[in-house]
Amino acid sequence: MTATRGFTLLEILLVLVLVSASAVAVIATFPVSVKDEAKISAQSFYQRLLLLNEEAILSGQDFGVRIDVDTRRLTFLQLTADKGWQKWQNDKMTNQTTLKEGLQLDFELGGGAWQKDDRLFNPGSLFDEEMFADEKKEQKQEPAPQLFVLSSGEVTPFTLSIFPKGQEPDEQWRVTAQENGTLRLLAPGESDEE
């Protein structure tokens, strides 16, 4: 009987498993580009806003989002009857997100009602708010949000652009809410006209 030379199927499969495992380990260590970070951040904000909109409709509560362009921070808020605007307490989602260092935000409220060109009155209260202040309620209240997600399904019209620092406007990922409450995620170069 002659002995055959060569590798068994088991040996070949073992080598393939080792090569594929090492390839996965190497690919996982590759850095993510800033353009990919912009895409991931825009998709994350869009999905969170959809979740917030659904939660508002189902629970009957009003929510808001505070956007700080300078610090690249997005804060999700909930309106409570006794404390006013507070950070949204949810086990499955963080209530505050800070974007990566290489990204930049551009935020613009939409709709004619939000523009300040044709105001009849100066913004602010007509009454002395200190007169009605309750000294017992000196609890820390979050600043009011710029975006409102109401239990009626309404969303403040806006455009939030997320892009790498120093890039042209055609590299922007945009999340928009239109006058009719439709939320859209727009890739770079994509137009929001349907």
Curated annotation (Swiss-Prot):
The modification N-methylphenylalanine is found at residue 7. It comes from Vibrio cholerae serotype O1 (strain ATCC 39315 / El Tor Inaba N16961). Belongs to the GSP H family. InterPro entries: N_methyl_site, Pilin-like, T2SS_GspH, T2SS_protein-GspH, T2SS_protein_J, TypeII_GspH. Component of the type II secretion system required for the energy-dependent secretion of extracellular factors such as proteases and toxins from the periplasm. Part of the pseudopilus tip complex that is critical for the recognition and binding of secretion substrates. Keywords: Cell inner membrane, Cell membrane, Membrane, Methylation, Protein transport, Transmembrane, Transmembrane helix, Transport. It is found in: Cell inner membrane. The chain crosses the membrane at residues 12-32. Type II secretion is composed of four main components: the outer membrane complex, the inner membrane complex, the cytoplasmic secretion ATPase and the periplasm-spanning pseudopilus. Interacts with core component EpsG. Cleaved by prepilin peptidase. The keyword Metal-binding does not apply. SUPFAM superfamilies: Pili subunits. The gene is epsH. GO terms for biological process: protein secretion by the type II secretion system. Residues 1-6 form a propeptide. Its main location: membrane. It is a single-pass membrane protein. One of its GO terms (cellular component) is plasma membrane. The lineage of its organism: Bacteria, Pseudomonadati, Pseudomonadota, Gammaproteobacteria, Vibrionales. This is Type II secretion system protein H.
